């Protein structure tokens, strides 16, 4: 019984952390109207589109400022803006895998 309580408590804590992270992400994504409540799915999809937009803007600014494309990746995660695939064809993150800690690991 104690193990079940511990497992339930850990799952509740994990779900609260996930929900908190989504709430923070929702605040960073511009929406119209501004107070629109987004589902988790909508939040992730809009976040990917917004990241794509920002990377393209940074890539274009880099091209305008230097006359050539900036070397390397932005934050080491994404290719340069002008070379990103369109969201219609595939998502930005499909080729990028982040290692996941096991269920017993805690990331501060």
From Swiss-Prot:
CDD domains found in the cross-reference section: bHLH_TS_TAL2
Keyword terms, alphabetized: Chromosomal rearrangement, DNA-binding, Proto-oncogene, Transcription, Transcription regulation
Keyword Cell membrane (UniProt): no
Disulfide bonds: none
InterPro entries assigned to the protein according to its UniProt record, in alphabetical order: bHLH_dom, HLH_DNA-bd_sf, TAL-like
bHLH domain boundaries: 2-54
Statement: the UniProt record of this protein carries the keyword Transcription: yes
GO CC annotation: chromatin
Region listing for Disordered, in residue ranges: 89-108
A Gene Ontology molecular function term of the record: RNA polymerase II cis-regulatory region sequence-specific DNA binding
SUPFAM superfamilies assigned to the protein according to its UniProt record, in alphabetical order: HLH, helix-loop-helix DNA-binding domain
Swiss-Prot/TrEMBL GO biological process terms: midbrain development; multicellular organism growth; post-embryonic development; regulation of transcription by RNA polymerase II; thalamus development
Medical condition linked: A chromosomal aberration involving TAL2 may be a cause of some T-cell acute lymphoblastic leukemia (T-ALL). Translocation t(7;9)(q34;q32) with TCRB.
Name of the featured protein: T-cell acute lymphocytic leukemia protein 2
């Amino acid at each position: 019984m104690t193990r079940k309580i511990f497992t339930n408590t850990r799952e509740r804590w994990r779900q609260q952390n996930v929900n908190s992270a989504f709430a923070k992400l929702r605040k960073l994504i511009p929406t119209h109207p501004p107070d629109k409540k987004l589902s988790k799915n909508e939040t992730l999809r809009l976040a990917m589109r917004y990241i794509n937009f920002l990377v393209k803007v940074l890539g274009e600014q880099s091209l305008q400022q230097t006359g050539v494309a900036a070397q390397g990746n932005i934050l080491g995660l994404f290719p340069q803006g002008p070379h990103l695939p369109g969201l219609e064809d595939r998502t930005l993150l499909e080729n990028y895998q982040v290692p996941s800690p096991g269920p017993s690991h805690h990331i501060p």
